[in-house]
Amino acid sequence: MASLTQQPRYKYTLFIHVCDNNQELYNMYNTKIEHHNSQLLTNTHPDSGFDVFVPKQTIMKHTSVNKVPMGIKCAMVKHKSSQDVPCGYYLYPRSSISKTNFRLANNVGIIDSGYRGVVTGMFDLIYTNQEETCDIYTRLLQICSPTLEPFKVVLVNDDNSLGSTQRNTGGFGSTGR
């Protein structure tokens, strides 16, 4: 069986770096990535998204938008002939978020190809006038390729492996109002 890194069967690869030497989160992503990538080889209809874990218990306030850093940095590339081209990707709510009072405040995150900062969700609360707790390792969001095609995922040990860009870590309005 060909390795996923030798012959890209899929057009896109997502590279993930777990921040702050969080070994437990790293192990969770490692397990999730192994399962995700095995599905690319065995499932004729693999998932379009890759779930993102909330890295720590978080109190969400009902009176404001809640910024929740996901504890990972990412880069996505598109495989074109003999080269890999950086590309943007999407951060979508998982369908199961509808069973909670959490809502992704901007509905979908568009992550530009040059962004190398921490992946972050901005949430507000609906249907409640009280703060709520989001438990550690809850999966509220998923990363999707620009075309919603399945993609392979690679866990990297160093955020330098994601490549440096002119933009780097600027996000949420950093390029203009």
Put a short name on every predicted segment:
Residues 1-177:
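DUTPase catalytic domain/fold
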